[in-house]
Amino acid sequence: MATHRKEPRWLSRLVVDSIHIEQLKEHGGLPGIRDENALEAALSRARNKWVYGQERDLPVLAAAYGFGLVTSHPYCDGNKRVGFLAIVTFLGINGRDFGATDSEVVTEILKLAGGQLSEGQLANWIRRHT
């Protein structure tokens, strides 16, 4: 397991909101934020793991973003898409590529949304594809 020693680049609220807006333009859906507190909590999960839990594994940190955004439903629509793209974007800005097939992505993100995939299992899946 490769660890990341220096502090990663984190996803800003602006970046995640922009991902949401772009996904709605491309695929449709209801605009807006359903739960502001859930969004802030989801965006804080990865950094909190780094600062307070001393977590250094990028797939674990990426999973924190995905898990938080998919399971807390902070937006009115598009949470699964935003959660997955947050994973990919976080990995990308920290020098890691993600390479799962579209069908694998759909299967795993739907399992996550349905409560059939834990955050740890998501991290393992991400690790296998980076």
Residue map of PLM features:
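FIC/Doc superfamily catalytic core
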Residues: M1-T130
